[in-house]
Regions:
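Active-site-facing substrate-recognition patch
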Residues: 227, 508-595, 604-605, 609, ...
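Arginine/glycine-rich "motif VI" loop of SF2 helicases in the C-terminal RecA-like domain
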Residues: 342-349, 589, 619, 688-692
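Helicase motor core with emphasis on the C-terminal RecA-like subdomain
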Residues: 10-13, 18-22, 28, 32-59, ...
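C-terminal accessory region of SF2 helicases/translocases
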Residues: 303, 325, 329-338, 344-545
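Active-site signature of alpha/beta-hydrolase-fold catalytic machinery across serine-
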Residues: 63-64, 68, 203, 610, ...
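PRPP-dependent phosphoribosyltransferase catalytic core
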Residues: 491, 507-514, 681-704
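A short, structured active-site edge motif that brings together acidic residues
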Residues: 106, 220-222, 284, 597, ...
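Interdomain "pre-motor" coupling segment immediately N-terminal to P-loop NTPase/helicase cores
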Residues: 1-7
Length: 704
């Protein structure tokens, strides 16, 4: 930093303190451990990994370092940040310190060109980018080289995402290693996280040191002195939801209620609103503008709680958040520590309550089932790519049997490994050799199972709950036998898990209210011609909107429907028939069905057939029997839409037009479970081709 006498002197702690006061107010005081990190970056130009508890002030460290480096004439700071909520909070924090900051992410596409110009012109002090942007062809080729050359500091926020040993690994984060390797050895790099055990710390530190010196690791204690941890065994889903409805008003301030699935978030939010509680659902499917409004509502205490999935997590900063409740346990105690860390940052006390359920492990198993694919599937992706002709992800789907999400994950991993490359227009192969690290993936799977068992152990422990979580994170400051003195096990003060019987029954009735609309498919997947199916464009002969009793992930009907689908095939039970009748009675169809047709099934022919017969009898509808499979049909194990449609094409014997015509109106088409919607779509085409004027699909359950 230049002084009046023309000399250049290293920045001082006093200068750092002044910037901190701009960030956090005149009452803020820079701590020794924060200055150690800042000094390592600004004075010694080190690469550092800071592992500190939520609320320690990691963002203050990199904003202070960014401003000090900028004052010395260095280039802008590049912050890689994973979530939009995190970016919004960080831009606001930078502005408070007089730092010119901008962000490039999926929600501000129209601003990208202007921001690129500001980067090239040197008008920005800080640029926040999502990890996905690092391999966007335009950004990678036009903006990233100058950033790598001119950057004064590179920051990797939520750095545990870099490591596939971490609880929230993101393939895009692996590109950061490439970015760091292209930096000059004297460009400081800072990685920050609150959730990294020894294995993750070692992995991240190694990746951080690529092309530079040894990584300085600064780890602090992870105790959260304000949090009072509790576990409440309240029973089944309805009883747990009733417990929440009865206790939410007594919880301090405003907070977050986490659920494991999107369906649960919406169910619980609707239930609580009906009980008069000001809450709203917040999930990964919530539109960006609505997310921002919901975050603002919570920050301003206009809502008692957001009922959220993990989409509301890293980076959301409300210092006075009074409580975090989990309606269902996450699969990792490390992920749990991170989510509960949202609470009590600036308050003397905050309540953290876990309401675990027996069905939690079903959700864990589902998410485990969509992990990294087999070697054969990955090699199919490599072989499908050409060296000189880019192919988009939708164009690749008909060539490989992977769903969109898993295909994108595979492409990102292969890109980092050098086997494929993203270019304008899609993806190309590189011809470089690639090895499938089966041993590593097996070890990762084993590590995930250990985390799941640890989460079960957390629920059952009679020891200190905070000490348990800190031990999972290998907290260097945790002493043998240390107790927090605040949790339910340390104090003996526990919430009563007993729920008023009438309230529980009322909640059960609300959650068990059957009926969920299923939207028909409107567009054929691209590339079907490559699979020998001559279908494209809009679907003109599919079904109308349909209904299911519920989703298998619902808090209400979910558990019952899972049991029905898992049990040996047999006649439909009375409670399921009654639920189906309620759904049909509340269905606001334009034209009532006049007939019922069951879909053939390998798993549940008796279940579906008996349900269709009962609906025909009770509704006085014509029973058309079963739409039979064709003998030559192909098995439908496909993961993506194109393969699934191709497999379903020609799967049923065409019904007799005279039989279909005898119905004299729309046909109710009955199935057991709908996942992608393609089975009902393809079957409806067959029925309509035989003369049905309309097809109304009905299934017991939807998977999502």
């Amino acid at each position: 930093m230049l002084h009046p006498d023309g000399s250049s002197r290293p920045p001082t702690r006093e200068q750092a303190q002044a910037i901190l006061e701009q960030l956090a107010g005149p009452q803020a005081t820079l701590r020794d451990d924060q200055w150690t990190a800042i000094e390592a970056l600004v004075v010694h130009r080190r690469r550092a990994l800071v592992v500190q508890r939520t609320g320690w002030g990691k963002s203050a460290v990199y904003f202070i370092a960014a401003k000090l480096l900028r004052a010395e004439g260095h280039g802008p700071t590049v912050i890689v940040s994973p979530l939009l909520a995190l970016m919004r909070n960080q831009v606001a924090a930078a502005e408070r310190a007089g730092v010119h900051a901008a962000t490039i992410n999926s929600s501000n596409v129209t601003d990208w060109a202007d921001i690129h110009d500001r980067v090239r012109n040197g008008d920005l002090d800080v640029l926040l980018v999502s990890p996905e942007r690092l391999n966007n062809p335009d950004f990678r080729d036009q903006v990233l080289p100058s950033l790598a050359h001119d950057a004064g500091l590179v920051v990797v926020d939520e750095a545990h995402c870099v490591s596939d040993w971490g609880h929230d690994f993101r393939p895009d984060y692996r590109r950061i290693r490439t970015l760091i390797g292209e930096l000059g050895a004297n460009v400081p790099v800072l990685a920050t996280t609150a959730t990294a055990n020894d294995r993750v710390v070692d992995d991240v530190a190694t990746q951080l040191g690529v092309g530079g010196g040894e990584t300085l690791v600064l780890r602090g204690g992870l105790d959260r002195e304000s949090l009072r941890l509790s576990v409440v065994r309240a029973g089944n889903p309805a009883q747990r939801a009733a417990w929440l409805a009865a206790h939410i008003d007594s919880l301090p301030g405003s907070g977050i209620v986490y659920t494991l699935t999107v369906a649960q978030a919406h169910d619980v939010a609707a239930l609580l609103r009906e009980r008069g509680h000001p809450v709203a659902a917040y999930t990964g499917s919530t539109e960006t503008a609505e997310r921002e409004q919901l975050e603002a509502d919570l920050l301003a205490n206009r809502v008692k709680a957001l009922i959220a999935t993990s989409a509301l997590g890293m980076g959301f900063d409300k210092p006075d958040l009074g409580f975090v409740v989990h309606l269902g346990a996450p699969s990792s105690p490390i992920a749990y520590y991170q989510q509960v860390g949202r609470a009590g940052r600036s308050t003397a006390s905050a309540e953290v309550v876990l309401l675990p359920g027996n069905e939690d492990q079903d959700v864990w198993r589902y998410f485990s089932s969509v992990a990294f694919p087999s070697e054969l599937m990955v090699r199919n992706v490599i072989h499908a790519l050409e060296l000189d002709r880019p192919q988009s992800t939708p164009a690749l789907e008909p060539l490989v049997d992977l769903g969109r999400t898993r295909l994108e994950m595979v492409l990102k991993v292969l890109d980092v490994d050098g086997a494929v490359r993203r270019v304008k227009g899609g993806w190309i192969g590189t011809g470089e050799p690639w090895e499938y690290d089966e041993a590593r993936y097996r070890k990762l799977d084993e590590a995930r199972k250990r985390e799941q068992q640890a989460m079960l152990d957390y629920q059952d422990t009679d020891g200190c709950r905070m000490a348990f979580l800190r031990s999972q994170l290998d907290d260097p400051d945790l002493l043998d036998g240390e107790r927090c003195g605040r949790c339910d096990n340390c104090t003996g003060s526990r919430y009563d898990g007993v729920v008023d019987a009438a309230a529980a029954e009322d909640t059960r009735a609300r959650l068990m209210r059957p009926g969920v609309e299923i939207t028909p498919r409107k567009q054929w997947p691209s590339g079907l011609a490559k699979l020998g199916v001559n279908l494209s464009g809009r679907i003109g002969d599919g079904p109308s909107p349909g209904r299911v009793i519920g989703r298998v992930t619902d808090l209400g009907w979910g558990a019952r429907l899972r049991r029905v689908l898992e049990e040996p095939d047999g006649e439909v039970s009375d409670d399921v028939v009654q639920a189906a009748v309620k759904v049909l009675a509340s269905w606001d169809w334009t034209t009532r069905p006049t007939a019922v047709l069951a879909l053939d099934s390998d798993k549940h022919p008796k279940l579906i057939g008996s349900l269709a017969r009962e609906l025909a009898r009770l509704g006085k509808l014509t029973d058309l029997g079963t739409l039979q499979y064709a003998p030559e049909r192909r098995p439908v194990a496909a993961a993506n839409s194109a393969y699934r449609v191709a497999a379903l094409h020609g799967s049923w014997l065409p019904p007799d037009p005279a039989v279909i015509g005898s119905a004299g109106g729309p046909v109710l088409l009955v199935d057991d479970v709908t996942d992608t919607g393609w089975t009902l779509t393809m079957a409806a085409r067959v029925v309509r081709a035989a003369g049905a004027p309309d097809v109304l699909p009905f299934a017991l359950a939807a998977t999502s």
